[in-house]
Amino acid sequence: MDTAQKQRWAITLSYDGSRFYGWQKQADGVPTVQAALETALAQIAGEAVSTTVAGRTDTGVHATAQVVHFDTTAARPQQAWVRGVNAHLPEGIAVLHARQVAPEFHARFDAYGRHYRYLLESVPVRSPLLKNRAGWTHLKLDIGPMRRAAALLIGEQDFSSFRAAECQAKSPVKTIYRADLTQSSGLVRLDLHGNAFLHHMVRNIMGALVYVGSGRLSVEGFAALIQERSRLKAPPTFMPDGLYLTGVDYPEAYGIIRPQIPEWL
């Protein structure tokens, strides 16, 4: 195959993580986002397509604006990679945008920022309508201490206390630019913007913040937890249900659209 004829495309997609066993293809053939997407892309391209993602997501984790790139020799109009691919995707995944990009564009390595939201339901009885869409605790949470604790995350730090044991990142040092907490009608929203995130980092942070909000961990204890740089004394990893990848930042020259977070979220 003549590689000079290849085109590189970037697509932005949204998916319901509760329907899939994470992003990455698996040998046993269980449904994953990558497997479903590559199958649909191949239908339009008329050839096998391999994808590279901005950031892999675990089972149950959602995305409103995941970014993927792929190479193909198939000359197709932009809408073929949107409406055409969507026609071949299973329920729970949709391509939002597609754009031909420079051959050197890389969905993972060119990303300089990532945005996550954790949606948490804090009510005595979990709503059946929000199951798989939001995390849940029956505990009443005090948002004030949670906000003060979240503010301690901002900056470049070693986040080993919020790192999964199986994390493959070369360094636990990451930079958090923004950590906002809001509360409305029994729903707590945690918005994090950072240069990159460790495996389970957001879910581990959420678990610790729930401890703070429920009085099981003080703000000072949260600060000490960060300094411990160890998972051994940290609260458990919180459920994946409420975690959403809501955006990826790229240099403007690539023209990658980052959609607004949906109003329902």
From Swiss-Prot:
A Pfam family this protein belongs to? PseudoU_synth_1
> InterPro entries given for it?
PsdUridine_synth_cat_dom_sf, PsdUridine_synth_TruA, PsdUridine_synth_TruA_a/b_dom, PsdUridine_synth_TruA_C, TruA/RsuA/RluB/E/F_N
Task: Report the Gene3D superfamilies cross-referenced here.
Answer: Pseudouridine synthase I, catalytic domain, C-terminal subdomain (3.30.70.660), Pseudouridine synthase I, catalytic domain, N-terminal subdomain (3.30.70.580)
Q: Which UniProt keywords apply?
A: Isomerase, tRNA processing
Show the catalytic activity: uridine(38/39/40) in tRNA = pseudouridine(38/39/40) in tRNA
Task: Give the first-level EC class, as a single word.
Answer: isomerase
Q: Which GO terms describe its molecular function?
A: RNA binding; tRNA pseudouridine(38-40) synthase activity
Which regions span the lipid bilayer?
none
Which EC number(s) are documented for this chain? 5.4.99.12
Active site at 58 (nucleophile)
Highest taxon, organism lineage: Bacteria
Where is substrate annotated to bind? 116
What is any one GO biological process for this UniProt entry? tRNA pseudouridine synthesis
Function summary: Formation of pseudouridine at positions 38, 39 and 40 in the anticodon stem and loop of transfer RNAs.
Family, per entry: Belongs to the tRNA pseudouridine synthase TruA family.
- Listed PANTHER family: PSEUDOURIDYLATE SYNTHASE, TRNA PSEUDOURIDINE SYNTHASE-LIKE 1
**SUBUNIT field:** Homodimer.
The protein here is known as tRNA pseudouridine synthase A
Which species is listed as the source? Neisseria meningitidis serogroup C / serotype 2a (strain ATCC 700532 / DSM 15464 / FAM18)
Report the gene name.
truA
